[in-house]
């Protein structure tokens, strides 16, 4: 039995983290398993009014690797709407093989991509709001610690410049990012806490001093400017009961620092931020952001997985589109069209070339290529995001 209330890797691999009706269905099929080869596709049921930064595929591949299945998917870090130009559902993943070999993993597959994609998409929206200013993912404390690496990885792919989690940072091959906690000021007092923080800031790290524990933020900022010659950031994590007009407070602090010739000290803000508040605070003068709950607890996308073909024949349930499909995207205008799987490319209505986004990642359970590292996936994501700057 696991110590914490989580499924182990082995539990997931055994299909124990699945809805029981999949297990019962496979048991009921029995000897007919060998004769039932299917193609299943994962599409989004909602929300449909926003684009999605597709994330979580890495874990799907780890789960299905070694099984006799073929898997096609849109690459992680690809950003697109869940419906094509004609209103058809976009298949993000297609798995082909014997149903009894992989059907019990439907729950896990959906869980991997629903939550990770929700987090990375929210991070991408914060990325757009922050502009060129850095923002960091500080939200793992709001979710179960067992999934903290997944949260940090997804936030990083979505656009976070760094993450606070030790395991999450290791997963993305980055150094974890942190400032100083209120606890340090409470235990030692502000001045001693600030000195200790600066003394322990390593070369290459940015020094960040928290200024809202006991003092008025303006006077704390002035005090720091007078006490220290080199400080990279002051951080305002002002609680909502004291915050008032946060934009006005930031402008006030910014003014006082500039008046004293300390425009070199930048302002970082945190506490209850999302893409809407980040945009307003950036316009007010904030230059870095710590974003937590809105990213780590982002609403998951409602992916669903459905059989679309049985033994080579198009078959599916009511409300779904039967048959294996490809997803074509125009290299010029980014128009998306869902087409039958035998169509690999076509000319777009704009005259550009439409190419298939689906990539074959597993062939009979074996990897077809080396999987990209998180940094490479993030790079793809940031290039994709350029197209969505003016699209809500």
Curated annotation (Swiss-Prot):
Keyword Transferase: yes
Residue numbers binding Zn(2+) 1: 330, 333, 350
Post-translational modification: Transiently phosphorylated on a His residue during the reaction cycle. Phosphorylation strongly increases the affinity for substrates and increases the rate of nicotinate D-ribonucleotide production. Dephosphorylation regenerates the low-affinity form of the enzyme, leading to product release.
BP GO annotations: NAD biosynthetic process
CDD domains: NAPRTase_B
Role according to the record: Catalyzes the synthesis of beta-nicotinate D-ribonucleotide from nicotinate and 5-phospho-D-ribose 1-phosphate at the expense of ATP.
Protein name: Putative nicotinate phosphoribosyltransferase
């Amino acid at each position: 039995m696991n110590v914490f209330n989580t499924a182990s890797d082995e539990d997931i691999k055994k299909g124990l983290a699945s809805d029981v009706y999949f297990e019962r269905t496979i048991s009921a099929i029995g000897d007919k398993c060998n004769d039932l080869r299917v193609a299943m596709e994962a599409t989004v049921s909602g929300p449909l009014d926003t684009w999605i930064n597709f994330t979580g595929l890495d874990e799907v591949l780890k789960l299905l690797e070694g099984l006799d299945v073929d898997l096609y998917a849109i690459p992680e870090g690809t950003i697109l709407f869940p419906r094509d130009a004609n209103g058809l559902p976009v298949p993000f993943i297609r798995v082909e093989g014997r149903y009894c070999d992989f059907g019990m993993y439907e729950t896990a597959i959906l869980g991997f991509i629903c939550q990770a994609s929700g987090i990375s998409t929210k991070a991408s929206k914060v990325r757009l709001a922050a502009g060129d200013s850095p923002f960091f993912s500080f939200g793992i404390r709001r979710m179960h610690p067992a999934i903290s690496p997944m949260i940090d990885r997804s936030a990083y792919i979505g656009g976070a410049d760094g993450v606070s989690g030790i395991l999450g940072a290791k997963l993305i091959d980055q150094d974890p990012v942190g400032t100083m906690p209120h606890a340090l000021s409470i235990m030692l007092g502000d001045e001693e806490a600030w000195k200790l923080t600066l003394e322990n800031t390593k070369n290459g790290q940015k020094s960040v001093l928290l200024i809202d524990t006991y003092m008025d933020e303006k006077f704390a900022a002035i005090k720091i400017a007078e006490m220290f010659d080199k400080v990279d950031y002051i951080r305002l994590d002002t609680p909502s009961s004291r915050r008032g007009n946060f934009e006005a407070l930031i402008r006030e602090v910014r003014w006082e620092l500039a008046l004293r010739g300390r425009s070199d000290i930048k302002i970082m803000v945190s506490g209850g931020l999302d893409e809407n508040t980040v945009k307003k605070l950036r316009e007010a003068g904030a230059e870095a952001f710590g974003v937590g709950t809105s990213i780590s607890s982002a609403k998951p996308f409602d992916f669903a997985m459905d059989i679309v073909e049985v033994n080579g024949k198009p078959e599916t349930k009511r409300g779904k589109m039967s048959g294996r499909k490809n997803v074509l995207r125009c290299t010029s205008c980014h128009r998306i069209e869902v087409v039958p799987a035998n169509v690999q490319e076509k000319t777009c209505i704009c005259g550009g070339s439409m190419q298939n986004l689906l990539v074959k990642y597993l062939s009979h359970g074996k990897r077809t290529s080396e999987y990209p590292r998180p940094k490479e996936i993030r790079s793809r994501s940031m290039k994709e995001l350029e197209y969505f700057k003016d699209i809500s």
